[in-house]
UniProtKB/Swiss-Prot annotation:
Belongs to the EccB family. GO terms for cellular component: extracellular region; plasma membrane. Coiled coil: none annotated. The lineage of its organism: Bacteria, Bacillati, Actinomycetota, Actinomycetes, Mycobacteriales. It holds the Pfam family T7SS_ESX1_EccB. This is ESX-3 secretion system ATPase EccB3. GO terms for molecular function: ATP binding; hydrolase activity. Its EC number is 3.6.-.-. It comes from the Bacteria. Signal peptide: none annotated. Part of the ESX-3 / type VII secretion system (T7SS), which is composed of cytosolic and membrane components. The ESX-3 membrane complex is composed of EccB3, EccC3, EccD3 and EccE3. Keywords: ATP-binding, Cell inner membrane, Cell membrane, Hydrolase, Membrane, Nucleotide-binding, Transmembrane, Transmembrane helix, Transport.
Amino acid sequence: MTGPVNPDDRRSFSSRTPVNENPDGVQYRRGFVTRHQVSGWRFVMRRIASGVALHDTRMLVDPLRTQSRAVLTGALILVTGLVGCFIFSLFRPGGVPGNNAILADRSTSALYVRVGEQLHPVLNLTSARLISGSPDNPTMVKTSEIDKFPRGNLLGIPGAPERMVQNAATDAEWTVCDAVGGANPGVTVIAGPLGADGERAAPLPPDHAVLVHSDAEPNPGDWLLWDGKRSPIDLADRAVTDALGLGGQALAPRPIAAGLFNAVPAAPALTAPVIPDAGAAPQFELSLPVPVGAVVVAYDADNTARYYAVLSDGLQPISPVLAAILRNTDSHGFAQPPRLGPDEVARTPMSRGLDTSAYPDNPVTLVEASAHPVTCAHWTKPSDAAESSLSVLSGAVLPLAEGLHTVDLVGAGAGGAANRVALTPGTGYFVQTVGAEPGSPTAGSMFWVSDTGVRYGIDTAEDDKVVAALGLSTSPLPVPWSVLSQFAAGPALSRGDALVAHDAVSTNPNSARMEASR
């Protein structure tokens, strides 16, 4: 047993923290280690390891450090490789079929579609999407994975489009051109905006027209294309030709293809209108004894002539051309149109019995076929417009936009198809037919127009999910049937047609051999 311990006899411990002799009283961090101390400690550790492993502490060489660096480099390469494999797998998956309905052989790119437990070869991606009911892209898998499934018959729609990428256009623009000469004779259909530089076909100038001849039934004969319409004309009717300013000319109508002829809306014939009660006295008073059917004239303050047709219930303003047609048909004995004062015209009732829009306002100038062999009908309907419009173009060459090229149709002329088409490569058009009238609603059948000039009907009567399965998300563009019929006819796109099984696919009767350079 020990006695009491004197506190002064206890062992004391001195702090390892240096005494702060800084006159400013700066506080030092406890346990602070410098970079040189760490470097020295590492050197001592390497020297101890060298002595244990190599029995040499002189450190003339340091093979252990080289080995550690090699191990670290190898580890970094391994990690980098693993990360690269992971990233590569995101872009090109390993090929597990999973629940995917559309598969593709990685080795041959052959397409397959799953129907139940069987895997069927399929003719094209469009057919596969129609069968699966979704616009999925094929999953690339190994051949060994393909061979694990029981095989079914060949399915699909022969001739269906391989890809369906929708054009981003929201304004509908369709053009049908007919060239009687030049580099591209025949009918050409152009989709999208036109080019307007140089000698490209442009809208007809005011008071210009194109004289054509059509052999198409049921109305063969001569026609005048003007102001976005076509009017039948009898070139032997001097009353009309003289009024139009065509008298005394050697008239030689150019031939017009059925495609362009049908694309231009028809107007009433250019003949003298029938006026009821012609020759009788009108039901209103005039200062001059003028019968019904006669033409009178009044002059403005600037001496501009204003022509009026005398009808039984009033006067109707008419154009100089219609006034000349009426006078050339029956002048009612007047060498010059009787003149009325402006005050008398203002007191006289007005009538609207004649269709004055069926006649040009002024005499026309015919476009020469030798200088301007290309004639076009340009149909357009902007997305924000309530009505469509059509204009007649004329020029020396096709109005193709810069960089746009034509594709010749194999079945040109078969079923009314054009000779060639011009569409932006890589994209097609989801369209819906519309009537020829400017205000017709877009409520017709739906089609897909490919960049190769083929139209495919989309059958929505059987299944309303067909449009979604094809990946067509935006609203269809309107197109008149007179233009759409110029594209080559392709098969209908429906799920029922896509599920048709084949042992073999027959050749297309409208096919043609293409000469390819070796």
